[in-house]
């Protein structure tokens, strides 16, 4: 390229111009807060479109956010965060990954899903299938739309009525039916990351759209789910995408403490971090978790966020699910099941609640991990799952082995060699797992679209934008939902500078 004096002068001028002028010159300064999958997707989309003046501020020392593939001794990598690719058609993560043969496969999680009682007895498949179908039909019933109570009231009332009066279920023991209802509630708590279905309105306006195809696709290879980050940035082996230097664009250990988005003398958005660093930006894309926004939004934004955004932050639920992986010195017994849902006899549950293992009521189910025959994972839900984060590894291991002594008493397990677990609620930079709707969401008449409303300047141009799974109306709680919102906000800026 031949550099003329005018061209050099133009570059120097762009570096010193007020924000609006520099942006008009096609050289906008863009700050992205957070280097989870939404931040990485936004940065990559912008960079490939020629908007390369990007700074990603990441509070931790790693890229990925709630995608956290971790080494687990001799077992290989496991997923402390996002576990499966949910769906195929209409899933941007699947569409990117499916280019690479063998990277995704149907998880063993989808089969050999058992109901097991605390005396170690497995519920016959013919009965378990009918109980699952009944509960799911109630949850998916359109009658919910006309109900003014909680989801818990709606489900329990209809379920018990069916069990009591419908001849189809006359052969099912009432005690077993109640055990299943408790277990189903725990399963739903894990699925939607709420503490209780009594915190959710029966008539909740849930716009979630399930993508087509298999809903539990496991990631293969040593990078596991983290492969999607490499695919997005073009660093995955065999990728044909241009490489985005995401690590060069990212500044680590940068905890954003304030975003001044209006009233600055030079027109820039001012982003301040806890270490005193200041970053000027024409545009900011905030991709931190909803949990972080709930904890910090009132102090983070100057002036305060518009009510429509703040109500969304306050109203959308952000709950916690955790995983504990156990690595045994022998394979998990073959007949144990790929997924084991826990059904408690009342006497056993009362004994648990009065013991030092009371926190273990948080465990909704155990499940095997694809291609890891020596590993078993426990899925922990709700308030007790958060409590468990504060306990030692030894205490957690002892409690889980106590559960296996009940529910797996008919099988011989090896010795636990090590455990690895997530602590999403107590992670200062995450503060939970994923979003869902609650009674508060309905009361405030809010939702993801309100959270995603951009903060605009006097010229009605977007200054601060929001991306992440909680900002997706149709695919919240998923990686592909987070990616879609990041593409949405990146496209907003790309179109602005065409």
Identify the role of each PLM range:
Residues 3-498:
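FAD-dinucleotide binding site
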């Amino acid at each position: 390229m031949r550099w003329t004096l005018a061209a050099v002068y133009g570059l120097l001028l762009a570096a010193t111009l007020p924000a609006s002028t520099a942006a008009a010159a096609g050289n906008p300064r863009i700050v992205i807060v957070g280097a989870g999958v939404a931040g990485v997707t936004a940065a990559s989309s912008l960079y490939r479109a020629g908007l390369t003046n990007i700074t990603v501020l990441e509070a931790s020392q790693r890229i990925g956010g709630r995608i956290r593939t971790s080494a687990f001794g001799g077992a290989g990598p496991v997923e402390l965060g996002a576990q499966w690719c949910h769906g195929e058609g209409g899933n941007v993560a699947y569409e990117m990954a499916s280019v690479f043969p063998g990277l995704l496969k149907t998880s063993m999680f989808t089969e050999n899903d058992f109901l097991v009682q605390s005396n170690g007895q497995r519920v016959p498949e013919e009965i378990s299938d009918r109980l699952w179908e009944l509960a799911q039909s109630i949850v998916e019933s359109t009658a919910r739309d006309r109900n003014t109570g909680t989801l818990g009231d709606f489900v329990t009332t209809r379920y018990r009525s069916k069990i009591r009066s419908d001849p189809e279920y006359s052969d099912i023991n009432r005690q077993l039916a109640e055990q299943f209802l408790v277990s189903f509630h725990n399963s739903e708590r894990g699925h939607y990351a709420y503490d209780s279905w009594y915190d959710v309105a029966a008539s909740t306006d849930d716009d979630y759209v399930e993508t087509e195809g298999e809903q539990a696709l496991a990631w293969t290879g040593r990078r596991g789910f983290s492969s999607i980050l490499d695919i997005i940035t073009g660093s995955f082996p065999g990728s044909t995408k241009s490489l985005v230097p995401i690590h060069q664009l990212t500044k680590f250990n940068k905890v954003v403490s304030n975003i001044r988005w209006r009233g600055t003398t030079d027109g820039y958005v001012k982003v301040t971090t806890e270490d005193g660093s200041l970053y000027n930006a024409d545009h900011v894309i905030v991709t931190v978790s909803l949990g972080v926004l709930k904890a910090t939004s009132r102090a983070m934004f100057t002036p305060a966020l518009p009510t429509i955004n703040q109500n969304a932050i306050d109203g959308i639920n952000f709950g916690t699910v955790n995983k504990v992986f156990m690595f045994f010195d022998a394979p998990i017994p073959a007949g144990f099941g790929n997924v084991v849902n826990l059904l408690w006899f009342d006497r056993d549950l009362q004994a648990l609640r009065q013991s030092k293992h009371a926190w273990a009521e948080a465990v909704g189910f155990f499940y095997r991990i694809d291609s890891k025959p020596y590993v078993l994972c426990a899925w922990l839900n709700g308030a007790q799952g958060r409590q468990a984060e504060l306990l030692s590894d030894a205490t957690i291991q002892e409690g889980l082995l106590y559960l296996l002594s009940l529910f797996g008493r008919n099988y011989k397990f090896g010795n636990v060699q090590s455990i690895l677990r997530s602590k999403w609620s107590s992670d200062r930079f995450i503060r939970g797992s994923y979003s869902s709707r609650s009674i508060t969401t309905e009361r405030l008449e809010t939702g993801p679209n309100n959270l995603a409303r951009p903060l605009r300047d006097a010229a009605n141009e977007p200054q601060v934008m929001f991306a992440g799974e909680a900002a997706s109306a149709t695919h919240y709680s998923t990686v592909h939902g987070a990616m879609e919102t990041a593409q949405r906000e990146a496209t907003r800026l790309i179109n602005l500078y065409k």
